[in-house]
C-alpha cells in the first residue's frame, strides 16, 4: 500500500515534536526500578505482580509499559512482561543511574538549548534561569547524588570497554593518574583488571575527601590547572569536553609535564565526532552529547578528529594514536 508522502512527513514531524517523551518515560521506568525488578524476578511478570513490586498503580503502569513495549524497550507475552536485551542495559549495574542523571529537572530543562541561549552563548541550563550556578544550587533541583551515581555508572562501563577492547592499554605502565577521577570508580576497575598498575585518583580536595578506600588506588587532591602527580601515564576520561580549546591546551600541557618524556603517555578517553565517512553505531549518540554540552556549558563541546589533533599539536605532543573501544568514547593516546 502506497504511503502518501505528505502524510509520512506529518507523521515524522509529530514523532519529532513528541520525541522527548520516550526518554522521559524510560526514566520513569528506571526510577520505578522496572528493569531491575524484571531482572531479579528472572521471568515473566503479570501487571499485578509488577504493580505490587514497583509500588505503581496498575493503570498508569499499564500505559507506561504499553508505550515502552511499542518502542522496543520491554517485551510482552501472554499479558505478562519481561526484559528485552535493551531493557537490561538500564539496570542499576548498567546505564540505569546515568539515565536518572539525565532525568533531573536541570538536565531536562529545554531552556539550555533554546534559541535565546544559542544567541547569547549563555546556557540557561546552568546559569541564566536564576542567575547562579545550578551545579551548586540544590534548591533548584540538580540532584548531586544522581549526578555522582550517573557518572560512576558511566565510568564503570567505559572502564569495562577499555579492559575488553584494549587489553594492552597498560602494558609497560606502572602508574596512572586519573584526572577528575572523583571516587575512583574508573581507575579502580582498571587496577582490578591490570593489577601491576598503581592507580591515582586525582580530583579537587573536597571530592577525594569523601572517597571510600579502593584497593590499589591512592587519592590525591589538587588543581589540574596547577600541577598533577607524577606517573607513567595520565588519563583524562570525559574531562576535556567540559572545557574550551585554550583550557584544554593548558590541561594537556600539565599532563605532559607529569609523565616521562621518553616513555610516558596521556590517555584521552572522550568522544570523536565523525565528520567524514560513515561513522559507527554511536555516531548519533556522540552528536547528541555535543548538543548536551552546548546546553550545559558555555565553552565545552565534543570534538572532531581534526579538532583533537589541533589541541595535541598546540600542547606540544609529537605523535598520537586512536583506539576504538566499541563504545561512545575512543582512547586517544598522546606521546611527548
From Swiss-Prot:
Catalytic residue list: 241
EC id: 2.1.1.-
Record note on biotechnological use: Nevadensin is a selective inhibitor of human carboxylesterase 1 (hCE-1), a key enzyme responsible for the hydrolysis of a wide range of endogenous and xenobiotic esters.
One Pfam family this sequence matches: Dimerisation
Keyword Transferase: yes
GO biological process, one term: methylation
One example GO MF annotation: O-methyltransferase activity
Protein's recorded name: Flavonoid 6-O-methyltransferase 4
Species of the source: Ocimum basilicum
Amino acid at each position: 500500500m502506497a504511503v502518501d508522502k505528505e502524510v509520512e512527513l506529518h507523521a515524522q514531524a509529530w514523532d519529532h515534536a513528541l520525541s522527548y517523551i520516550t526518554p522521559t518515560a524510560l526514566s520513569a521506568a528506571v526510577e520505578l526500578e522496572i528493569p531491575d525488578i524484571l531482572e531479579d524476578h528472572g521471568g515473566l511478570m503479570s501487571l499485578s505482580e509488577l504493580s505490587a513490586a514497583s509500588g505503581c498503580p496498575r493503570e498508569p503502569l499499564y500505559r507506561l509499559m504499553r508505550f515502552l513495549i511499542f518502542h522496543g524497550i520491554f517485551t510482552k507475552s501472554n499479558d505478562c512482561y519481561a526484559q528485552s536485551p535493551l531493557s537490561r542495559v538500564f539496570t542499576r549495574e548498567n546505564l540505569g543511574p546515568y539515565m536518572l542523571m539525565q532525568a533531573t529537572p536541570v538536565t531536562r530543562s529545554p531552556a539550555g538549548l533554546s534559541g535565546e541561549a544559542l544567541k547569547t552563548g549563555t546556557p540557561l541550563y546552568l546559569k541564566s534561569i536564576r542567575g547562579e550556578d545550578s551545579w551548586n544550587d540544590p534548591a533548584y533541583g540538580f540532584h548531586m547524588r544522581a549526578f555522582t551515581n550517573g557518572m560512576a555508572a558511566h565510568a564503570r562501563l567505559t572502564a569495562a570497554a577499555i579492559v575488553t577492547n584494549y587489553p594492552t592499554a597498560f602494558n609497560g605502565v606502572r602508574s596512572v593518574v586519573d584526572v577528575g577521577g572523583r571516587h575512583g570508580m574508573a581507575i579502580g576497575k582498571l587496577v582490578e583488571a591490570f593489577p601491576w598498575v598503581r592507580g591515582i585518583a586525582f580530583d579537587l580536595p573536597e571530592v577525594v575527601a569523601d572517597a571510600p578506600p579502593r584497593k590499589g588506588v591512592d587519592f590525591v587532591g589538587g588543581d589540574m590547572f596547577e600541577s598533577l602527580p607524577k606517573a607513567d601515564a595520565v588519563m583524562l576520561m570525559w574531562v576535556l569536553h567540559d572545557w574550551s580549546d585554550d583550557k584544554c591546551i593548558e590541561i594537556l600541557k600539565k599532563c605532559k609535564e607529569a609523565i616521562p618524556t621518553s616513555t610516558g603517555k596521556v590517555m584521552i578517553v572522550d568522544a570523536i565526532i565523525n565528520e567524514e565517512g560513515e561513522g559507527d553505531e554511536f555516531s548519533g549518540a556522540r552528536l547528541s552529547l555535543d548538543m548536551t554540552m552546548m546546553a550545559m556549558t558555555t565553552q565545552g563541546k565534543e570534538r572532531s578528529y581534526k579538532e583533537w589533533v589541533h589541541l595535541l599539536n598546540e600542547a606540544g605532543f609529537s605523535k598520537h594514536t586512536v583506539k576504538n573501544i566499541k563504545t561512545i568514547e575512543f582512547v586517544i593516546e598522546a606521546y611527548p
